[in-house]
Amino acid sequence: MQSPDGQETGRPAAILIAGPTASGKSALGLRIARAFGGTVINTDSMQVYADLRVLSARPTAEEEGLAPHRLYGSIDGAVNFSVGHFQRQAAALLSEMDAGSLPVFVGGTGLYFRSLDEGISDLPEVPDAVRQRIRIEADGQPTETLHAALALRDPESAERLRPSDRMRVMRALEIHAATGRSIGSFHEARVPGPLAGKPLLKLFLATEREALRQRIDARFVTMMEQGALDEVAALRERRLDPLLPVMRAHGVPGLIAHLDGTISRQEAIQRGQGDTRRYAKRQFTWFRHQMGEAWHWTTPEAAWSLVQARLSAPAGR
């Protein structure tokens, strides 16, 4: 059921908690799951990786023991885990959950949330051999050179992509090499989301900017105290492709540079803090422009009150 302003008012089939990093999403998700018999489901592209428990701010083992947590730390860093992988895993998990269990999706990755409801483009899987060939060809090449190569093969995609966006330029090159088609030609066909058409409570924790900045900076220092450098050192020893998502996580490039001896520990911390602050700003911007009016921009306490009100409503009301 909807109110006159278009907002859902009845009991939701799932709760979606998004927001910038360090905004209190995990704590709210755990609170809801404990109070209402829910399962906390990771919706963050870095917290899926087993390699980055500390640096991705995954829930602690103690927190995971207080309520069921799923899709956390289940993927090896060598895997290029995509939104398509996430959507399939989330759909499978939802089909396995007991009817009375409340799914509580928690994270900061906008495309993951979109895949749950609106669905995603049906992009083909790129064979590992093709991906490796493109990576070898691109090794040592400036991104602008790769963009020029894309313009010759797939001018439509090159027109849409910034010449400095290496990750997306590489993705377009891989898709074209694997299929002979523009990546844009796959965007019309969509895979529907597993929560499409269901009543949802969508919460975006819009923490005050200066307070968020201070929390981000303090949290990065705490991560260092909790072993983030050792975590990255172990990742560095694996010598993974630097374009893999796990190698581009906030804090990883700077800490690797410190381990390589090119910058100091303090410079690595400052770089990680700055990268994370800029990411939080992009999260605000993306959700504001991409996710529509169905999302409640709120604080953790106001969100908790809203959850209590919605979950006390009879089904179908």
UniProtKB/Swiss-Prot annotation:
Chain spans, region Interaction with substrate tRNA: 44-47
SUPFAM superfamilies according to UniProt: P-loop containing nucleoside triphosphate hydrolases
InterPro entries according to UniProt: Dimethylallyltransferase, IPT, P-loop_NTPase
Keyword Magnesium found: yes
Presence of keyword ATP-binding: yes
Disulfide topology: none
GO biological process terms held by the UniProt record: tRNA modification
Reaction catalyzed: adenosine(37) in tRNA + dimethylallyl diphosphate = N(6)-dimethylallyladenosine(37) in tRNA + diphosphate
Binding site for substrate: T21, A22, S23, G24, K25, S26
UniProt GO molecular function: ATP binding; tRNA dimethylallyltransferase activity
EC number(s) from the headed UniProt entry: 2.5.1.75
Site (Interaction with substrate tRNA): residue numbering on this chain: T109, R131
Residues that, per the record, bind ATP: G19, P20, T21, A22, S23, G24, K25, S26
UniProt cofactor(s): Mg(2+)
The protein's role, per its UniProt record: Catalyzes the transfer of a dimethylallyl group onto the adenine at position 37 in tRNAs that read codons beginning with uridine, leading to the formation of N6-(dimethylallyl)adenosine (i(6)A).
Subunit structure: Monomer.
Similarity section: Belongs to the IPP transferase family.
Listed HAMAP family: IPP_trans
Stated name of the protein: tRNA dimethylallyltransferase
Gene: miaA
